[in-house]
């Protein structure tokens, strides 16, 4: 039965020694964000009023990474078991709220399963998430009498008969705050590990005549924990395949779903096609009929209808209107904006640059801190020299400007509409409308020139 309020406790104090890392285990990333952030997000989605994060190892790193002001930080100075961790959080529990216990290293738990668990919790009893395994070795076993859950016995404390049980405890449970505080106060560490087990409260509830309702998750991967990098990589692939399947069913054509990574949120139009080894990060919005070539990385971008990103291009924090073409091997850095029909070709880099309607930068150019009008042609090898060693400066180019190859525009500088800049020119002063600017050294011809001979 639901209480009107619910708080969540996330256990995240483990050292993660098997990760062989200076980073706390729960900060290792899955799909681009820390494992524990996945758990926090699931908790928030269930409508939790408070999230208590129990931490120990690497507290400063955790607080630096997890900046949500809604988190209540609870220190577990010594790691003496799950029951001990919950005892540290217990002073924050209200009597009339549900307390949901989660783990920072179980990143794929879904909000749907948590809602189901909460709805199944009996009045005065416990909702418990369990699964059945073909090989339950190492896990706490669910002990039943006449079908009812009466206790959990850890593997090291289990008898041979109990070790034959294949229903295991996932560690995720929910109980009323008042009841939970009472049970936590009665825990002891009389077991093989010398730890305080949260699982002992199951027997306490049963002894009081309270019902324990076992619920199963939709997928086994939801309750799989991470103790080493091999397990983390396995969950990463499970997660990515799930995201790929959702996109395929929603109409996105992934040419090889096994070679696609989504590390954020993707919204899309119809008939989107993505080739192999595409990585999508942050918040990305793709319009209708967008094509993404092999090996591209797209982060926090909006890409308009009928645009095409050719292979091995990297786009970050950029906005592209309809019918833009990018790459191959192009880079759009944060602040890049392309109007309809703009083209950025191979080995061209943009940073805080706006390219107007139909403008083109086809080859080997750097355009930084630039505002470029419509119908502009940027020749190969053009550079906006935006940095003077101390400060950045802006280049402004009007409409219908032709910039010849190997041009340097030394900012701050303005090139008015209709101007033409000859190849090899270094522009240091403003250019007026329809002017031709050329600063090359006059070409000389020397007949009969003898090359130097190499000395032996």
Curated annotation (Swiss-Prot):
At which positions is acetyl-CoA bound?
Answer: 380, 386-387, 405, 423, 440
A biological process (GO) of this protein is: UDP-N-acetylglucosamine biosynthetic process
Reactions mediated catalytically: alpha-D-glucosamine 1-phosphate + acetyl-CoA = N-acetyl-alpha-D-glucosamine 1-phosphate + CoA + H(+); N-acetyl-alpha-D-glucosamine 1-phosphate + UTP + H(+) = UDP-N-acetyl-alpha-D-glucosamine + diphosphate
**A Pfam cross-reference name:** NTP_transf_3
Output the Gene Ontology cellular-component terms. cytoplasm; membrane
Identify the CDD domains for this entry. GT2_GlmU_N_bac (cd02540), LbH_GlmU_C (cd03353)
**Note on cofactor:** Binds 1 Mg(2+) ion per subunit.
The answer to keyword Nuclease applying to this record is no
Instruction: Tell me which cofactor or cofactors this protein depends on.
Output: Mg(2+)
The UniProt record gives the binding positions of UDP-N-acetyl-alpha-D-glucosamine as: 11-14, 25, 76, 81-82, 103-105, 140, 154, 169, 227, 333, 351, 366, 377
Region forming the signal peptide: none
Give the EC number(s) listed in the UniProt record. 2.7.7.23, 2.3.1.157
Using the UniProt annotation, give all residue ranges assigned to the region (Linker): 230-250
UniProt keywords (A-Z) are: Acyltransferase, Cell shape, Cell wall biogenesis/degradation, Cytoplasm, Magnesium, Metal-binding, Multifunctional enzyme, Nucleotidyltransferase, Peptidoglycan synthesis, Repeat, Transferase
Q: Which residues bind Mg(2+)?
A: 105, 227
The UniProt record lists the keyword Acyltransferase: yes
Q: Where does the protein end up?
A: Cytoplasm
Q: Which GO terms describe its molecular function?
A: glucosamine-1-phosphate N-acetyltransferase activity; magnesium ion binding; UDP-N-acetylglucosamine diphosphorylase activity
Residues covered by region (Pyrophosphorylase)? 1-229
List the active site.
Answer: 363 (proton acceptor)
The record's family statement is: In the N-terminal section; belongs to the N-acetylglucosamine-1-phosphate uridyltransferase family. In the C-terminal section; belongs to the transferase hexapeptide repeat family.
NCBIfam families recorded for this chain?
glmU, PRK09451.1
Purpose: Catalyzes the last two sequential reactions in the de novo biosynthetic pathway for UDP-N-acetylglucosamine (UDP-GlcNAc). The C-terminal domain catalyzes the transfer of acetyl group from acetyl coenzyme A to glucosamine-1-phosphate (GlcN-1-P) to produce N-acetylglucosamine-1-phosphate (GlcNAc-1-P), which is converted into UDP-GlcNAc by the transfer of uridine 5-monophosphate (from uridine 5-triphosphate), a reaction catalyzed by the N-terminal domain.
What is the annotated quaternary arrangement, including any partners? Homotrimer.
Indicate what this protein is called per its UniProt record: Bifunctional protein GlmU
The species is Pectobacterium atrosepticum (strain SCRI 1043 / ATCC BAA-672)
Name of the gene this protein is made from:
glmU
